[in-house]
Regions:
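Catalytic core of pol beta-like nucleotidyltransferases
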Residues: 1-38, 47-52, 62-122
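Short beta-strand->loop micro-motif that forms the acidic, two-metal-ion catalytic signature
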Residues: 57-61
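Glycine-rich beta-strand-to-loop/alpha-helix junction loops that act as flexible
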Residues: 42-44
């Protein structure tokens, strides 16, 4: 899994909890700039019990003609400095489906249990 952190801020024990409103606003920023098919929140903020040190984990479903790593970097670089860490994964729908069909437990869990924050056309 390739991720990139947009974190610029305090140590985890000094951070405050991140509201869903803040997370949705972040997803909307990404959606406006990159027009993804979907943005899915996963990890402790989606299906766990986040604490003050929890990061925000996002799967951005979109075509990645420049490659997944470059796409992740472009998304991360577009974000303003944040007081929390954001881990972004960018995958095309075809890649997600192919990986799920080949037994990728991680992507199965993310697409099954994650919270869709943005869906194009909805």
């Amino acid at each position: 899994m390739v991720t990139r952190s947009a974190f610029q801020g305090q140590e985890p024990e000094k951070r405050t909890r991140i509201s869903m409103r803040t997370i949705r606003a972040l997803a909307n920023q990404i959606a406006e700039k990159f027009d993804p098919e979907e943005i899915i929140l996963f990890g402790s903020h989606a299906y766990g019990k986040p604490d003050a040190g929890s990061d925000v984990d996002l799967l951005v479903v979109m075509e990645t003609p420049k490659g997944e790593v470059k796409t992740i970097m472009e998304i991360s670089d577009s974000l303003p400095p944040l007081p929390f860490r954001v881990d972004i994964i960018a995958r095309s729908r075809a890649t997600i489906n192919r990986r799920k069909n080949s037994g990728d437990f991680f992507l199965r869990e993310v697409t099954k249990r994650g919270k869709v924050l943005y869906a194009r056309g909805h």
